[in-house]
Each structure stands twice: as C-alpha cells, then as structure tokens.
C-alpha cells in the first residue's frame, strides 16, 4: 500500500529563500493535520497509511533528516533559518536553539525540562519537542514541533513505530514516550507561548534576528 508523498510546501517552506540579514525565525500553528516524513523516510515504512487516507491527512517529505512527525493545530512549529559561511557542529546548534526554547518554557513555569537524544526536549523522560535540521550551501534551517495540547492518540493513529529511535525512548510506544505541555502542566494560550519564545530569541540574538509576522 502506498500514499502520495508531497513535496514539503507548508507555511515555513519559503524561509530558505527569503531575504534577511542573518537569522529569521517563524513560529506558526498548522491549519490542518499532516504527516511530515524525514528525507530518508518512506511513508510505507513510517506512516499508518490506511488511517491517513481515511482521514484525508496529507503526507509531506521534508529536506531535513530525522523521523516522521504529525503536525496538528494543537502544536506549534518553530522554524529558524540562518545565513552561514561555514556550517559548524549541528549538535551545538540544536543545543543552542533548544536551550533557548527551554528558557522560554521555564519562564512560563514549566518544570523538569531537559535536552534528550540528539535534538529533543522532554519533560522528565517524555518528549514534548522534536527537531530536525537541513542546510544548503548558504543557510541552515532548523525546525521543531512542540506538542502544546495534542492527544497522543492522534500521533499513534498516523505514525508507525519509528525505524530509528533515541536511546532514552527504550522501545516505548508513542503513547508511553510522547506527552504534551497541557497534560504535564496546564493549558496555555498559543500566543502566550509564541510570544515568550520570540522574546527569548530576540533578547539572545538582538539585531541579528528577524521575527516573521505570520
């Protein structure tokens, strides 16, 4: 069984070609459910195709690596493009961005946040954010999916168990491994989270960063 893998063309798809000074950040909320698979993934191996087709959920293939993710209107996507002369250590860039996200979420009172795996953020041992990175000759492109309030059953409905997983997952199912901010803490307004993250990045990068008004 197969399903069409569309070229990635979601809200942040133009950020690699936009004109900006050094760094551009866009925090956005998906308008509909979608599955986005990594560059090395195949939908047949990672997507629950019957459920995706039944529900009319489109599958997109991104340029960055990593495993497949579900996007819904109950999540926030954090996208950052950066002009580069030399692409350094990707782990350092993941850590820089993810630590700033942790700083912002901590200001909202969310506790027990930490870096996990290659590029995840977790509350305790449960994942709330996964991120991936792509680069071309001129720019790096980081994007992360933050689960604000989505029910994990939705993720389970559209994704099979990943072909690769971080050590800290230890074979756990999506239901056992993933959580949301609202489940672990309390419900926040999406704009409240968006604003505090934009402020933290603006304070850190100053005039180097441009925040997209989306």
Roles of regions detected by a PLM:
Residues 22-23, 64, 116, 141:
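Short beta-strand-initiation
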Residues 1-46, 50, 54, 62, ...:
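Active-site loop/lid in soluble adenylation, ligation, and acyl-transfer enzymes
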Residues 30-32, 64, 73, 114-118:
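Short Gly/Ser/Thr- and Asp/Glu-enriched loop/turn motifs at secondary-structure junctions
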Residues 76-201:
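Catalytic beta-strand/loop module used to bind and position nucleotide/cofactor moieties
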